[in-house]
C-alpha cells in the first residue's frame, strides 16, 4: 500500500490511534443501521478501503426482520435486488475493541445509484427531521432513560 493510499489513516481520531498503538490496521467494518436499528454491512481488508470508495449492498436488507427472515410485502419489483450505495462517513470512524485485530468501524450514509439519498435509510430520515427543526429555529433535545428493575431473589 502506497503512503498516499494510507494517508487518511493518520487523520483518524486520537482515541482510535491510541487504541491501535503500533498494531497494523487489518480490517474495516462498513456498517449501516437497518429499520430496526440492527447493524448491517460488510467487512473488508484495509487494502480494499479508502474513505472515497463507495460500496454496494442489496436493498433487500431493508426487508429483513431482526430474526433474519423476510417481510411479506406487496411491493412491485421487491426482489429485483437493486443495489444501494454505502458512502463512508469518516467522522464516525471508531475502534472495535472486541475484535482480535486492530479494526476500524465506519458508519455509512446510504444513497441510490444516481447519488440521491435513500429516503428510507434511518440516518437520512434523521437528517431530514433535523433539517425541519433547523428551519423552525428549534433544537431537539433527547432524554434517554435506562430502565431497570430491582427485585428480590425468587427462592422457589
Name every feature range the model reports, one short phrase each.
Residues 1-156:
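ATP/Mg2+-dependent ligation/transfer catalytic cores
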